[in-house]
Amino acid sequence: MPLSFGDLVTGWHSTGIPNIAMFVHISGDAFPEGDLSKLPDGPTQAQREAHRARAVVEVTGVDGAVARSVIETVNGYSYTPLAAVEAARRVLEGERLSGFATPANVFGDGFAERIEGTLITDF
């Protein structure tokens, strides 16, 4: 299913790669509609630990060469606050840029892997 996420914007700002598309596997009522305040609380810690997040990226160069990588990490509900704390820690230590920047722009390619339990595999 094609979706429009912030990753599409930040991906271009971080890499300069045009024509980025994002597809997500969705099952059941993963994207409910209506009054979102009526949604149940997020997953429990046990549920988050049982369901890790995975994403695949494929890039095709102008010469037709294809590069693929997979990131596997903790559940998104866990990853987001861990990454925010890591980013804040690094900013407080002086690692920052003025104006708009993505995490990859500011902290470099290895930022995602600084989050414990995260592994990126290149194919």
What role is predicted for each listed range?
Residues 1-123:
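C-terminal catalytic/substrate-binding lobe primarily of soluble NAD(P)-dependent oxidoreductases
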